[in-house]
Amino acid sequence: MNINKIALIYNHNSKHLAIIEEIKKLYNYCKIEEAEVIIVIGGDGELLHNIHRYMHLNIPFYGVNLGNLGFLMNPLDTKKLLQNIHESTVSILNPLLMQVEDTSGQIYTALAINEVSIFRKTNQAAKFRIEVNGIERMSELVADGALVATPAGSSAYNLSASGPILPLESNMLCLTPICSFRPRRWHGALLLSSATIKFEILNTNKRPVNATADFQEFNNITNVTVKSTKDKPVKLLFNKNHTLEDRIIKEQFGG
C-alpha cells in the first residue's frame, strides 16, 4: 500500500504522552482532510469516537493500541509503525443504521460500528416485541435489554451477553438478549446482514427503555429499527500478521 499523507489523532490528556511524542517525531503528519490514512492512538473507544467523527471522509483508519483490550487496534511498535502501515491489510466494516422514536414522537438516526443496544432505564425489566423483515418473531421478550451486533462488534458487548462471535466475512448479524427473563431459554438469533430488525417497546410508561448506537444514547424510546448499511463503509487497517479475522478466530478459542 503506497501511502504518502498520514494524519495523527490522539487524546491530548493521555497518560502516554511520552510515547505519543515519539510517534509524532516519526513523520511529518498532514491535516486530517488531506490524509490517505488516519492513525488513531489510544484504545477501542478512542478509535470508535474518531471513526464516527471522520468516517464521512472515506479515509482508512489505523489504530495503535495504548489502551486495554484494543480489539480493533494494532500493537504498538514504534520502530516499524510506518512499515506496518504500508504493508497492512484492509478490513471493510459496514455499520448498523439505527432509527429510534421516543415517547414525544421525535425520530433520531445514528450509526453503530459495534452494536445497537436497548436496555431498561429503571429497576424493572423491559418488555418488547421483535419483528424481523416485517414479520413478528417474538410477541414479548422480558429482559434487561437486547442488542444487535455486527461481526466486528460480536466479540465486544455481544460476547459479554453470551452471544456468538461471528467471522468478519459472514454477512450475519447477532440478535442477543441481555439477561432474558421470559422466554428464559431464548439465547438470541443469527440473522442475515440484509435483515431489518424492529423492537417495539411495550408499556413504556411503567418500563422506560433507552437505546444506544455504540456510545450515542437516546432516552425513553418507543421503537427501534436496525439494519446494516453499505452506504458508509469503514476501512480499518491491520498489520499483515495481526488481522481482524485472526483476532476473531483467536477470541473463539479463549485467546
Swiss-Prot record:
Catalysed reactions, semicolon-separated: NAD(+) + ATP = ADP + NADP(+) + H(+)
Residues noted as binding NAD(+) in the record, renumbered to the chain: D44, G45, H49, N114, E115, D144, A152, S155, A156, Y157, N158, L159, S160, Q216
Active site: D44
Highest taxon listed in the record's lineage: Bacteria
Disulfide bonds: none
Keywords recorded for this protein, A-Z: ATP-binding, Cytoplasm, Kinase, NAD, NADP, Nucleotide-binding, Transferase
Location(s) in or outside the cell: Cytoplasm
EC supergroup of this enzyme: transferase
GO cellular component: cytoplasm
Gene Ontology MF: a single term: metal ion binding
Principal location listed in the UniProt entry: cytoplasm
EC number: 2.7.1.23
BP-aspect Gene Ontology terms: NAD metabolic process; NADP biosynthetic process
Cofactor: a divalent metal cation
Pfam families: NAD_kinase (PF01513), NAD_kinase_C (PF20143)
NCBIfam families reported in the protein's UniProt record: PRK04761.1
The family this protein is said to belong to: Belongs to the NAD kinase family.
Protein role: Involved in the regulation of the intracellular balance of NAD and NADP, and is a key enzyme in the biosynthesis of NADP. Catalyzes specifically the phosphorylation on 2'-hydroxyl of the adenosine moiety of NAD to yield NADP.
Protein name: NAD kinase
Organism: Rickettsia peacockii (strain Rustic)
Organism lineage string: Bacteria, Pseudomonadati, Pseudomonadota, Alphaproteobacteria, Rickettsiales
